[in-house]
Swiss-Prot record:
Name of the gene encoding the protein in the UniProt record: pfkC
InterPro entries in the cross-refs: ADP_PFK/GK, ADP_PFK/GK_arc, ADP_PFK_arc, Ribokinase-like
Binding site for Mg(2+): E268, E298, D441
Enzyme class: transferase
Record's subcellular location: Cytoplasm
Described purpose of this protein according to its UniProt entry: Catalyzes the phosphorylation of fructose 6-phosphate to fructose 1,6-bisphosphate using ADP as the phosphate donor.
Organism: Thermococcus zilligii
GO annotations of cellular component type: cytoplasm
Binding note for cofactor: Binds 1 Mg(2+) ion per subunit.
Cofactor annotation: Mg(2+)
GO molecular function terms attached to this record: ADP-specific phosphofructokinase activity; magnesium ion binding; phosphofructokinase activity
Catalytic activity: beta-D-fructose 6-phosphate + ADP = beta-D-fructose 1,6-bisphosphate + AMP + H(+)
Protein name: ADP-specific phosphofructokinase
Pfam families: ADP_PFK_GK
Keyword Acetylation recorded: no
Amino acid sequence: MVRELLEKARGLSIYTAYNTNVDAIVYLNGETVQRLIDEFGADAVRKRMEDYPREINEPLDFVARLVHALKTGKPMAVPLVNEELHTWFDSHFRYDVERMGGQAGIIANLLSNLDFREVIVYTPHLAKRQAEMFVRKPNLFYPVVEGGRLVLKHPWEAYREGDPVKVNRIFEFRAGTAFKLGDERIVVPFSGRFIVSARFESIRIYTEPGLRPFLPEIGERVDGAILSGYQGINLRYSDGKDANYYLRKAKEDIMLLKREKDLKVHLEFASIQSRELRKKVIYNLFPLADSVGMDEAEIAYVLSALGYDELADRIFTYNRIEDTVLGGKILLDEMNLDVLQIHTIYYIMYITHADNPLSEEELRRSLELATTLAASRASLGDITSPDQIEIGLRVPYNERGEYVKLRFEEAKRKLRTKEYKLVIIPTRLVQNPVSTVGLGDTISTGAFASYLAMLKEKGEL
């Protein structure tokens, strides 16, 4: 079932933009964490944890947020806004791996390695170091304008000298890692990652003016678009531009992609620390999207920005499925989405309206493909061929699977759901993942691509 659906999806052409970066990965151990705590002192770290810095301006901000992430076992991303800290990080850590990062880059390489018919990736900054991190496959293209025409080149042939490179530092942690914060012994409850995401003025999210007139041609050429990276927009820039300017351009990009046909557009949402920016992204872009993907922390952030603070707090505090379902229904209706996809450690969920062309069984198959691809990636660290889906098929569903199904049925009984199609499946959970980076992107890509493939088969695309 999963194999056949992947085969159908591989016949699609997909456009993805905007964010790529270099991921510098550190595999954390208890000794490294202990060294960092000892350098600053447990009291100073604990006090800064209470302050809960929203961005990293100095090393202690980093250590405090890292220890908080390890203590909760939840994946987190915090922006680094002080460029001078590059030297501190590089002197304190040896990077185990450098590879493609950024949602658009990860998604492009994944689709290309799965042998999709055509993958067009766009990022406004394409330095040689970045371009060389794209896989060298004949189905992967980067759009450029030459002689007044749209030309598709391979990314490694289209780089520009002098373009800036964004480096994100990713600290992978394993469940069971132990260290001490003063007298408190902390054992990490879940595997995950802590991302120090560079947020510098030189890196912006936009489509170059010369390429924008050709977005309708790209939209007509592809079956779907996956857009991401809006968390990289700053509220204000020193040259006078601001978030409103870049979000206006982002809205225009979506409308241009959809101009020649009703192109299905998926937005992959990522945590945005600034409530003001989060609200702007939601209200400007979600109503133009057909599909949105996020995790349970991100849906809580979104609901908070929309004014549903009590519900958001319940999701943050209790992680109850019924609260996530209620929040998903609100978001689906208020933003007029076709489909909302929510992924967590233990389950993946689709929420659509009752008139969605796909049946609940078909939606379930889409999620099965998504979790299987993610299990393959977690097992191997990356997916380099479509055959590797077999690895994911051998990964068992997590031990909370039956509990998830039970709570989901209870939630459906409690809430009015007749106007919706609600589907949930337990995740295939790798106990000791090689890497957790890109798992959410893999889930969303597998889900959206298979969703498109089944729509196309029904003549609905």
